[in-house]
Swiss-Prot record:
S-adenosyl-L-methionine binds at T71, D100, D124, A125, S141. Pathway: Quinol/quinone metabolism; menaquinone biosynthesis; menaquinol from 1,4-dihydroxy-2-naphthoate: step 2/2; Cofactor biosynthesis; ubiquinone biosynthesis. Belongs to the class I-like SAM-binding methyltransferase superfamily. MenG/UbiE family. InterPro entries: SAM-dependent_MTases_sf, UbiE/COQ5_MeTrFase, UbiE/COQ5_MeTrFase_CS. It comes from the Bacteria. It comes from Phenylobacterium zucineum (strain HLK1). HAMAP family: MenG_UbiE_methyltr. Methyltransferase required for the conversion of demethylmenaquinol (DMKH2) to menaquinol (MKH2) and the conversion of 2-polyprenyl-6-methoxy-1,4-benzoquinol (DDMQH2) to 2-polyprenyl-3-methyl-6-methoxy-1,4-benzoquinol (DMQH2). This is Ubiquinone/menaquinone biosynthesis C-methyltransferase UbiE. Its EC number is 2.1.1.163, 2.1.1.201. GO terms for molecular function: 2-methoxy-6-polyprenyl-1,4-benzoquinol methyltransferase activity; demethylmenaquinone methyltransferase activity. One of its GO terms (biological process) is methylation. The gene is ubiE. Keywords: Menaquinone biosynthesis, Methyltransferase, S-adenosyl-L-methionine, Transferase, Ubiquinone biosynthesis. It catalyses: a 2-demethylmenaquinol + S-adenosyl-L-methionine = a menaquinol + S-adenosyl-L-homocysteine + H(+); a 2-methoxy-6-(all-trans-polyprenyl)benzene-1,4-diol + S-adenosyl-L-methionine = a 5-methoxy-2-methyl-3-(all-trans-polyprenyl)benzene-1,4-diol + S-adenosyl-L-homocysteine + H(+).
């Protein structure tokens, strides 16, 4: 390896290779992506996502970025919440941009039905195809750990947010108790790849996804990275005793 390295599961690879490797994983799992999250979280991810949407509280007229938005699971929540608020008190339509590096994920999302507020775009979280200070909110769910250069993606999030804009990142994290960590490790490394092989015929992709969670920074370290990227009011909320965490901040 002659250039900068990046993590790909438990492997260290050339940073230039990681985007293609990650793209391959999501090419294979795109049609079963929501099933994948059900397996990774035992179905609890749906409650976590509802909590994120409630925290975001989308409003009429807002521009919301759903980065690494995949199949649009979160974007649809945001669009419908903003629409309900609009029905109550009027205002302009919200705009929700789903931006994902993987075209297969975008295609899977589009196939799930039309929502007038949602726009679909293939794009890189490290180089978003958007102008400065264009968004009221930036959300990334279960995606930041797959980015090659996480600090670059955080700086890019700061760039596209308006002053005071909201940053929300939902990601798998570290359980806060040792017994839960041991139980989660057992489930992750023994059960999830086996289910992935039986249900999707793809052990390798699910093994990568489990490993990528373990290589991701813990709650405090990732909160520090968000602050270093130029956000204020940085904090996090643990979900299910730290199996996942919602990280938040405000653009300065």
């Amino acid at each position: 390896m002659t250039g900068p390295s990046a993590t790909f599961g438990f492997r260290d690879v050339d940073a230039r290779e990681k985007p293609g490797l990650v793209r391959g994983v999501f090419d294979r799992v795109a049609r079963r992506y929501d099933l994948m999250n059900d397996l990774m979280s035992a179905g609890v991810h749906r409650l976590w996502k509802d909590a994120v949407a409630a925290r975001l509280n989308p409003q009429p007229g807002e521009t919301i970025l759903d980065v690494a938005g995949g199949t649009g699971d979160m974007a649809r929540r945001f669009a419908r919440m903003a629409r309900r608020a609009q029905e109550r008190r009027g205002g302009d339509d919200a705009k929700v941009f789903v931006i994902d590096y993987n075209a297969e994920m975008i295609a899977a999302g589009r196939e799930r039905g039309f929502e007038p507020e949602i726009c679909w775009t293939v794009g890189d979280a490290q180089r978003l195809p958007l102008p400065d200070a264009c968004a009221d909110a930036y959300v990334i769910s279960f995606g930041i750990r797959n980015v090659t250069d996480i600090p670059a993606a955080l700086r890019e999030a700061r760039r596209v947010l308006k002053p005071g804009g909201r940053f929300l990142c939902l990601e798998f994290s570290r359980p806060v108790t040792e017994p839960l960590q041991r139980a989660y490790d057992l489930y992750s490394f023994k059960v999830i790849p086996e289910i992935g092989e039986r249900v999707a015929g793809d052990r390798e992709s699910y093994q990568y996804l489990v490993e990528s969670i373990r290589r991701f920074p813990d709650q405090k370290r990732f909160a520090g990275m968000i602050g270093e990227a130029g956000f204020s009011r940085v904090g996090y909320t643990n979900f299910t005793a730290g199996v996942a965490a919602l990280h938040t901040g405000r653009a300065i």
